[in-house]
């Protein structure tokens, strides 16, 4: 009997480096947020929760591991 490659599955959630569309501020956010994530500079909404993966309203620059 063959063993599966990953005995411990990796999480599907990630941290993302995003750039605010309004002011250009770069910020690190979670991909599955429980609350609204706002820009620290201008207050614009960057990510909205949906009960799972959030709706990202900013430009994704990098996916952090």
Swiss-Prot record:
PROSITE patterns: RIBOSOMAL_S27E. Keywords: Metal-binding, Ribonucleoprotein, Ribosomal protein, Zinc, Zinc-finger. Its cofactor is Zn(2+). GO terms for molecular function: structural constituent of ribosome; zinc ion binding. GO terms for cellular component: ribonucleoprotein complex; ribosome. HAMAP family: Ribosomal_eS27. NCBIfam families: PRK00415.1. Binds 1 zinc ion per subunit. GO terms for biological process: translation. Belongs to the eukaryotic ribosomal protein eS27 family. A zinc finger (C4-type) spans 20-42. Zn(2+) binds at residues 20, 23, 39, 42. This is Small ribosomal subunit protein eS27. Part of the 30S ribosomal subunit. InterPro entries: Ribosomal_eS27, Ribosomal_eS27_Zn-bd_dom_sf, Ribosomal_zn-bd.
